[in-house]
Amino acid sequence: MEFILGIFCVLFCLRAGAGFGVDPSLQIDIFEDLQLGEATPGVQQVQGFHNRSKAFLFQDTSRSIKASTENAERIFQKLRNKHEFTILVTLKQAMLNSGVILSIHHSDHRYLELESSGHRNEVRLHYRSGSHRSQTEVFPYILADDKWHRFSIAISASHLVLHIDCNKIYERIVEKTFMDVPPGTALWVGQRNNVHGYFKGIMQDLQIVVMPQGFISQCPDLNRTCPTCNDFHGLVQKIMELQDILAKTSAKLSRAEQRMNRLDQCYCERSCTVKGNIYRELESWMDGCKKCTCTNGTAQCETLTCSAPNCLSGFSPAYVPGKCCKECQTVCVFQGQMYFEEEREAVYSSSGQCVLFQCKDNTMRRIESPECLPLNCPQSQHITLRNSCCKVCKGHDFCSEGHNCMGYSICKNLDDKAVCICRDGFRALREDNAYCEDIDECTEGRHYCRENTVCVNTPGSFMCVCQTGYLKIDDYSCTEHNECATNQHSCDENAMCFNTVGGHNCVCQPGYTGNGTDCRAFCKDGCRNGGTCIAPNICACPQGFTGPSCESDIDECTEGFVQCDSRANCINLPGWYHCECRDGYHDNGMFSLGGESCEDIDECATGRHSCSNDTVCFNLDGGFDCRCPHGKNCSGDCTHEGKIKHNGQIWVLENDRCSVCSCQVGLVMCRRMVCDCENPTVDLFCCPECDPRLSSQCLHQSGELTYKSGDTWVQNCQQCRCLQGEVDCWPLPCPAIDCEFSVVPESECCPRCVSDPCQADIIRNDITKTCVDETNVVRFTGSSWIKHGTECTLCQCKNGHMCCSVDPQCLQEL
């Protein structure tokens, strides 16, 4: 999508109209914020390109021009999450110097760095992209020529424009920058750090302008009326945000419709179901001696507190069936005893005759005694009852005739009546034991749980639960559990288990690191280039690397692992290789790995030959020949860069003083200068390996290695060279690929084609291709969203392909 959007921006932005002013609040004056002045070590205030601002000479290498933490943070606050800004500087760089103008980096991550190489005559912009990858844009240009230049590089989303001396030199489509710099990020001026990238020359007006087309502050006559790519990206982003809102709203509406459909078919009022009875929300009822209320679908009960009723004459408090508290009931007084309504009394005369009385309307009335059934037990086991003239046998089941024992109260037969008693573990709520409640032995201290246990109350009893790390001996006691001995611990397989009181500790074995439950092998020197530490000080290296720490690249070319086509040369890369077409050949566009797609260049047909006018160019496989027509006396001269070079003439290239060319019978032959280190006048710029001075040595970026002048090495996908004490690094050249989806494998530097778009991290985005997500919402290419119904599944639309993956860090944070 970046590529398509960038093309749109380039086509859309036709420059026309007049310039506008610049808001000073959007300008970051680096020199002013760093408070550079005469007292700053390593720099000297000098005459600049103009007199309106200070200019500084950067010459000494014993300098440390770095913004303080507070000043750097103030600058970063203006830059964070910005995708539209311009770096401007007016400078006069010493010839052949390779130095950093401005560097914003954290550890090894360069968020924004601008450097100019006088060794390779190019300007480089290093930045961190939105995909969190390091990117480098190289612009061939001689900036280090000891002349004044006004330089600006404007970034607008994926659109980059470079102006030098108010002339547009380059315009490119790039990946969007990522300027969310973390705390602790450093800002350096005129150097990368304390030992590398020293700029030599004069700088003036070093600024960052956080606005569209900020180059206008340096070159006010340039036009800036056109909307920028960032404007367009912002519009697309808003569309994507609205699209996401639409998707979420649609999902909510769908869920609401489903719920409404279910609501139409059911009664949704909350209720409580207790003992087969249904009670509505907030409805109250009596359950024995407890008052209950249905609250939020749950029955909540509390024990009633009964107060003695104040009864009138002829009434007395008594329990009523189905009621917890006593109520006033009518009474009768008979033979000095009090009887309640319906209560009976059997009276025996001296002759043994039984008369039955019953309390009715405050009066004991004689009633007819029912006929007594014959008893099937001996006379000695007959039991006389107070409320009946009929006797019963000993052991008669009074409970079966009815009782008022409720809940946790049970009925018990006595010799002449039935009574209620509470079950074990319960206590009476009233004196007749008709209602009982559970005794909480734990809170009342009526349990027998011993040390290392926790008392848990249960209905009618309690239980003793062992504390963590202990095992049960019996119902009331526990003993310490050795999880280590029983292999019931949580230690990693590479950890040692130590038993403790009530638990255990895990400690990683020597050679492993972690918290004990998760131990990982530790390699003292680390595993480089994507290697994995699989055992103490043992690295498993990815393909293409070897060594104890995977520090050595396998040269597939010299080791004979690769056989390139005869028309190609094998070029080694970190972790990989490619077959590059030899001089005289070019790729036909198929970009085959082994060089089979290399084909001959017809120098004669394309005009890329050096034959003079008196000879005839004849194409050869991988080259050409200048042939003299039969019977004609040819000079053998050559044509080079529009000039005639005589046969046998030798010259040095104008833009490369280290290359020597010669004309040999119409053919121009160029080679690097032969270095004779014994010659005291040898050019040390072209032959740095002949420089024996210690001051010409270079320190490796890690600070652990020293290189001699002329040495080369590869560091972070860059080819580096030590040249007279200065380190200059440039991106490794990658073979061209032609595919829709590609990926840069870990520890490698160049992209490879892949067929699965979900594996790709580099995509030729096509804005016309869309995806339909799980809620049937159309998504643009490049958009991302959290999958419906999940919290940690991120989905992306990649050229019509929907790719979803789970974020492990998100899962850990849930």
Swiss-Prot record:
UniProt xrefs under SUPFAM superfamilies: Concanavalin A-like lectins/glucanases, EGF/Laminin, FnI-like domain, Growth factor receptor domain
GO CC, one annotated term: cytoplasm
Signal peptide: 1-19
Subcellular location field: Secreted
Disulfide bond annotation, renumbered to this chain: 399-411, 405-420, 422-436, 442-455, 449-464, 466-478, 484-497, 491-506, 508-519, 523-533, 527-539, 541-550, 557-570, 564-579, 581-598, 604-617, 611-626, 628-634
Domain Laminin G-like span(s) in chain numbering: 53-226
Keywords, ordered alphabetically: Calcium, Disulfide bond, EGF-like domain, Glycoprotein, Metal-binding, Repeat, Secreted, Signal
SMART domains per the UniProt record, alphabetical: EGF (SM00181), EGF_CA (SM00179), LamG (SM00282), TSPN (SM00210), VWC (SM00214), VWC_out (SM00215)
Subunit-level organization: Homotrimer.
This protein's name: Protein kinase C-binding protein NELL2
Lineage, top ranks: Eukaryota, Metazoa, Chordata, Craniata, Vertebrata
